[in-house]
Swiss-Prot record:
The disulfide bond which can form in the large chain dimeric partners within the hexadecamer appears to be associated with oxidative stress and protein turnover. It catalyses: 2 (2R)-3-phosphoglycerate + 2 H(+) = D-ribulose 1,5-bisphosphate + CO2 + H2O; D-ribulose 1,5-bisphosphate + O2 = 2-phosphoglycolate + (2R)-3-phosphoglycerate + 2 H(+). Heterohexadecamer of 8 large chains and 8 small chains; disulfide-linked. The disulfide link is formed within the large subunit homodimers. This is Ribulose bisphosphate carboxylase large chain. Its cofactor is Mg(2+). Its EC number is 4.1.1.39. The gene is rbcL. InterPro entries: RuBisCO, RuBisCo_large_chain_AS, RuBisCO_lsu_C, RuBisCO_lsu_C_sf, RuBisCO_lsu_fd_N, RuBisCO_lsu_N_sf, RuBisCO_lsuI. The keyword Plastid applies. Binds 1 Mg(2+) ion per subunit. The basic functional RuBisCO is composed of a large chain homodimer in a 'head-to-tail' conformation. In form I RuBisCO this homodimer is arranged in a barrel-like tetramer with the small subunits forming a tetrameric 'cap' on each end of the 'barrel'. Mg(2+) binds at K192, D194, E195. GO terms for biological process: photorespiration; reductive pentose-phosphate cycle. The record marks K325 as: Transition state stabilizer.
Length: 455
């Protein structure tokens, strides 16, 4: 017969290749696949590989003009999920040529762009990605990273302390700056714009930036410590976002902030490049992450969003608390915390890490624990997150019965007590409450905080 063999054919003939040996340059993905009833797992896994790479629903004439073997995604392994009927982990390898260099946006458009609406699947979740060295090297990554940040701030050997200014909406710029000053003066390292503070009618961005800068210079002069306030540069357009970052730089402040999921990866990478070029640290908030990562069987796990952020660029990122008001299992959380901070992370399924990830000296990101935490949580947080982290107490600072500055004092005293106890070899997990109680004997501010929030 003339021409090519037209018609719909099974994906698994082309895209399910259990003998395939993965290459060092491949991007590897682990998908949790829930096929529709009657769809075999091989076909579902192959369909994912096809739809997220070169495949389309029918054979097309132009297939003959490409080298499919060079460009197709391959489902190379399938395993059942323990304890779940009809769920499988499908491992897919993508050739590096399918992706634009230095573009998280393109990486996600390819891997998770179309395939999640696929009819043959009831649900699909991207659990993990292995980013090959060759691709990592096309990204700038975090503007500065953990070590450079410590050097800029001159703060070593302990976690950093932050506080989100509340009420998050409705304060005037002057009163907002006042709250910032009180917290920093009391002993915090950072204060933070809430993620939804951008530039609203009750407080325009330029006024807020000005009063916050005034607050942090005053606090710096009085405490002899370097202080920061995360000025949220997130805006409706990239141009406006950069304009805000430029103004922050002109004020001489150390750090700005961005909501990377609502702002988008393209905007985030642009801001990250600007921050590295101009010596600004970049704090990242993950507003909207639960829309993507909360469902256990559909969407994307946060560890994928965290890896993507490390590529796109950010010096801090919110990553759950393990102890506060928002959910997060301890081992899983520590898994992606390591993926953010460490240079090399071994595959470890008990911590949700499906692939060994080598970051080839891309700078690390500080995880930020934030949400419903207070002084009694301090020993656990110090133990779980270690020194390279930012602990953020919003209500846990501003809710102090004596006011903001004493709230900040209470947190700083609690932190210093925990760090000292740890350095003396005491066990924070078992003696935590004891350590806080001892410290509160000589700090009335901490004692008052201990009264308000029970253990």
């Amino acid at each position: 017969s003339v021409g090519f063999k037209a018609g719909v054919k099974d994906y698994k003939l082309t895209y399910y290749t259990p003998d395939y040996k993965t290459k060092d340059t491949d991007i590897l993905a682990a998908f949790r696949v829930t096929p529709q009833p009657g769809v075999p797992p091989e076909e579902a896994g192959a369909a994912v590989a096809a739809e997220s790479s070169t495949g389309t629903w029918t054979t097309v004439w132009t297939d003959g003009l490409t080298s499919l073997d060079r460009y197709k995604g391959r489902c190379y392994h399938i395993e059942p999920v323990a304890g779940e009927e009809s769920q499988f982990i499908a491992y897919v390898a993508y050739p590096l040529d399918l992706f634009e260099e230095g573009s998280v946006t393109n990486m996600f458009t390819s891997i998770v762009g179309n395939v999640f609406g696929f009819k043959a699947l009831r649900a699909l979740r991207l659990e993990d990605l292995r980013i090959p060295n060759a691709y990592v090297k096309t990204f700038q990554g975090p503007p500065h990273g953990i070590q450079v940040e410590r050097d800029k701030l001159n703060k070593y050997g302990r976690p950093l302390l932050g506080c989100t200014i509340k009420p998050k909406l409705g304060l005037s710029a002057k009163n907002y700056g006042r709250a910032v000053y009180e917290c920093l003066r009391g002993g915090l390292d950072f204060t933070k714009d809430d993620e939804n503070v951008n530039s609203q009618p009750f407080m325009r961005w330029r006024d807020r930036f000005l009063f916050c800068a005034e607050a942090l210079y005053k606090a710096q002069a009085e405490t002899g410590e370097i202080k920061g306030h995360y000025l949220n540069a997130t805006a409706g357009t990239c141009e406006e976002m950069i304009k805000r970052a430029v103004f922050a730089r002109e004020l001489g402040v150390p750090i700005v902030m961005h909501d990377y999921l609502t702002g988008g990866f393209t905007a985030n990478t642009s801001l990250s490049h600007y921050c590295r070029d101009n010596g600004l640290l970049l704090h990242i908030h993950r507003a909207m992450h639960a829309v993507i990562d909360r469902q256990k069987n559909h969407g994307m796990h946060f560890r994928v969003l965290a890896k993507a952020l490390r590529l796109s660029g950010g010096d801090h990122i919110h990553s759950g608390t393990v102890v506060g008001k928002l959910e997060g299992e301890r081992e899983i959380t520590l898994g992606f915390v390591d993926l953010l901070r460490d240079d090399f992370v071994e595959k470890d399924r008990s911590r949700g890490i499906y692939f060994t990830q080598d970051w080839v000296s891309l700078p690390g990101v500080l995880p930020v624990a934030s949400g419903g935490i207070h002084v009694w949580h301090m020993p656990a947080l110090t133990e779980i997150f270690g020194d390279d982290s930012v602990l953020q107490f919003g209500g846990g600072t501003l809710g102090h019965p004596w006011g903001n500055a004493p709230g900040a004092v209470a947190n700083r005293v609690a932190l210093e007590a925990c760090v000292q106890a740890r350095n003396e070899g005491r066990d924070l997990a078992s003696e935590g409450n004891q350590i806080i109680r001892e410290a509160s004997k000589w700090s009335p501010e901490l004692a008052a905080a201990c009264e308000v929030w029970k253990e």
